Amino acid sequence: MCCLSFASCGKQSVAVSPDEMASRAAKIYYDYLLHGDCAAYVDGFYRPDSIPESYREQLIVSAKQYVGQMKTDHQGLVSVEAAGARTDTAKHVGEAYLMLGFGDKTKEEIVVPLVLHNGNWMLR
């Protein structure tokens, strides 16, 4: 641990723009779908209040159905690429643009609405 703190002393931190952070967050959430982790995808949605576990399970089933529909329609999701984002940090909202690649070689650009909550970009 001591070595790590000394090694990082000489590095300068690189500021990352809110747009870049939102873009990265959206990609991570869709990467969860790509890798079949529907629970992590569902947990990426902003909810101001807690929800019952039974409702969370329904949302996970819905995400699995979405993944299944992509398999049926396009031979599955095979890649997720960040294509940019626009954010309004004063209003704590943004939208990220992702390019989804499918097994049938088609691509689709989607808009992912996001909300900034406690410093984290979350799905809206």
Positions of the model-derived regions?
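Short amphipathic alpha-helical segments, especially helix-boundary/capping motifs
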Residues: C3-L4, V14-S17, A39, R86-T87
